């Protein structure tokens, strides 16, 4: 009886592979890529909070938070890391607000960055689908979901009611995109804004626009919020920012990364490296003084950060020690992993 069932199962598997192609069904243990492939986020603290050393490839990421909290900065750092590792990046600028000079300061190669500023939400999502399906893109950032305005709303009159249009658009798009994103190992980052539900007496009134589909399809959801202002004398030079992993399908969620986002510079690599090294006792802290290998490197956090910025050899050494202490790799090269990607047929 058991042999009959095995023969029947083998016949069914062969039929499925014949109809839908090799690899359409397999035993979980046979799948070659069991280890989660990642791309560094551009922030060591965020790599640790994500639990797998970066953004998982072939997955959807949602980055949301209040205005000017650092959502686009976090996403641009991811693009810079992809390009640094030999990958190709695209930016769908639905808000029409990308600053090329700022992106360049964060390490983005703007000459190689693919940019689209769509007129409608449908156009933006179709462009994203075409790029992902090509199999030649490693990361695509959509900024933002709230700005993906349906064509019917743009063509209609100001003030006209269009209930649920954007939610339906996002639901349909994600149903179509999720499969090709996974097959081509593309990272899709959706930046989102915050809205408040009217009449909520208890609980959190905050929600994100675009319906519930993105919440379900996202493997990782990051909440970005400003914690405090950073001052140098009387001048405000940046913000202390908390990035909370509110959803994570590849590692335990609810971890928090604290980073310094400096105006005109982006995430301070020195600041997060200093904090993480102190936490692992790789850099000593006595009162206001910081020390490394019996040598004092600065009084006060800002001075210690400046010392590290002025001594790149020491920073590279500490970075390696911190990565080893937290079990984070240097990030794999994208070009090698991309060889296994397949190009998907575009819809006619």
Curated annotation (Swiss-Prot):
The keyword Transmembrane is assigned to this record: no
Protein's cellular compartments: Cytoplasm
Primary location group: cytoplasm
GO process terms (BP): DNA recombination; DNA repair; SOS response
InterPro entries: AAA+_ATPase, DNA_recomb/repair_RecA, DNA_recomb/repair_RecA_CS, P-loop_NTPase, RecA-like_C, RecA-like_N, RecA_ATP-bd, RecA_C_sf
One annotated GO molecular function: ATP-dependent DNA damage sensor activity
Top-level lineage group: Bacteria
UniProt entry keywords in alphabetical sequence: ATP-binding, Cytoplasm, DNA damage, DNA recombination, DNA repair, DNA-binding, Nucleotide-binding, SOS response
GO CC terms: cytosol
Cross-referenced SMART domains: AAA (SM00382)
Chain sites annotated for binding ATP: 65-72
Family: Belongs to the RecA family.
Primary role: Can catalyze the hydrolysis of ATP in the presence of single-stranded DNA, the ATP-dependent uptake of single-stranded DNA by duplex DNA, and the ATP-dependent hybridization of homologous single-stranded DNAs. It interacts with LexA causing its activation and leading to its autocatalytic cleavage.
Protein name: Protein RecA
Source organism of the structure: Enterococcus faecalis (strain ATCC 700802 / V583)
Lineage of the organism: Bacteria, Bacillati, Bacillota, Bacilli, Lactobacillales
């Amino acid at each position: 009886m058991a042999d009959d069932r095995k023969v029947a199962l083998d016949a069914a598997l062969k039929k499925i592979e014949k109809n839908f192609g090799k690899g359409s069904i397999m035993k979980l243990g046979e799948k070659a890529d069991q280890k989660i492939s990642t791309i560094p986020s551009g922030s060591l603290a965020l790599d640790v909070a994500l639990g797998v050393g970066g953004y998982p490839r072939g997955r959807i990421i949602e980055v949301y938070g209040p205005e000017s909290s650092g959502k686009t900065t976090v996403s641009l750092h991811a693009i810079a890391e992809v390009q640094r590792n030999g990958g190709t990046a695209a930016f769908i600028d639905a808000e029409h607000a990308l600053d090329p000079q700022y992106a360049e300061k964060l390490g983005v190669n703007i000459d190689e960055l693919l940019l689209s500023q769509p007129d409608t939400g449908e156009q933006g999502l179709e462009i994203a689908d075409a790029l992902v399906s090509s199999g030649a893109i490693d990361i695509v950032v959509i900024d933002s979901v709230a700005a993906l305005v349906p064509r019917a709303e743009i063509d209609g009159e100001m003030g006209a009611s269009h209930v649920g249009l954007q939610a339906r658009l996002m639901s349909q798009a994600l149903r179509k995109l999720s499969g090709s994103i996974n097959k081509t190992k593309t990272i899709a980052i959706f930046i989102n804004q915050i809205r408040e539900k009217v009449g909520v007496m208890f609980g959190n009134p905050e929600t994100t626009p675009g319906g519930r589909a993105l919440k379900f399809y996202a493997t990782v959801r990051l909440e970005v919020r400003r914690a405090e202002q950073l001052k140098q004398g009387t001048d405000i030079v940046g913000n202390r920012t908390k990035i909370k992993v509110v959803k994570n399908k590849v590692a335990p969620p609810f971890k928090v990364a604290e980073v310094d986002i400096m105006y005109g510079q982006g995430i301070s690599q020195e600041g997060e490296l200093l904090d993480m090294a102190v936490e692992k006792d790789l850099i000593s802290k006595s009162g206001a003084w910081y020390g490394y290998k019996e040598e004092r490197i600065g009084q006060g956090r800002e001075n210690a950060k400046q010392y590290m910025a002025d001594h790149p050899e020491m920073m590279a050494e500490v970075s390696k020690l911190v990565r080893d202490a937290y079990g984070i790799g240097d990030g794999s090269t994208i070009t090698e992993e991309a060889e296994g990607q397949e190009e998907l047929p575009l819809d006619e």
